Amino acid sequence: MKLNFIITKLQASIEGKQEEFFKSYSSLTDDTKAWCIVDLVNSSNYRLLKGPKLGYVRGETFFTLIKNVISANNQVRLIKEIGDAVLLASDSLRPLLECVILINQISRNLKLTQPEEIYPFEVRCGFSYGIAKKLIRHNEDFLGSSIDQLARIMSVRSTTSNICVQEEAYSHFEEILKEYNSFMTISEPKKLLPKDTKNLIQDITYREIIIDWENLLKFNDHFVDWRK
């Protein structure tokens, strides 16, 4: 069988499905959520430097950290694992924010108790808000511009914060965010440069969330699910 025939046959089988995809799209349900990505920083470089065994241990430590923190809060769903990162979702930003704060504080503790000079244990986090289509796939998945924007926001590298929030999420949940202002400040809006958005035709504006870690430990409100 000639290669050209094989290619033509495979292409026809794909094109034949497109009409079915158009029809099935209208049946997909919309889900409006707060979204969060938590990423293990420099995981690939750490594996290259330290080898696969230590890289595996660090990766499993990260995923255990995520799962142990979110298990106390039934409002947070682990949608999927993406390499050395996770996509989380909730109806409100509050449970995601509290999970991320706890994850960050524990990461800071691990960084101090298990010192690593070149690639210390660190996480990077981002939030967004918006509608996404729930896809019909073997594993649960979603498709939407709010998740696309969040993925781009995760490219931000800052010396002041490792937590960013999409402007839409900030606007929608601003009053909730203010409840944590005894240890948390929010930057002025910033815009992602085209080079950081993979030429996305939509502007992305975000803010940095800066945590005062000493004042966090004096905070006696909220975090209800972990105080039980």
PLM region spans:
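Short acidic/polar alpha-helix capping motifs at helix-coil junctions
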Residues: 6-8, 32, 48-49, 114-117, ...
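Catalytic beta-strand-to-alpha-helix segment of the class III nucleotidyl cyclase homology domain
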Residues: 90-203
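Acidic-enriched, low-complexity/disordered segments with a strong bias for Aspartate over Glutamate
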Residues: 30-31, 39, 84, 91, ...
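Detector for Asparagine
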Residues: 4, 42-45, 68, 73-74, ...
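Catalytic NTP-binding/metal-coordinating core of nucleotidyl cyclase/transferase enzymes
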Residues: 14, 18-98
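Intrinsically disordered, glycine/charged-rich C-terminal tails and inter-domain linkers
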Residues: 1-24, 159-228
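Glycine-centered flexibility motif
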Residues: 28-30, 51, 83-85, 130, ...
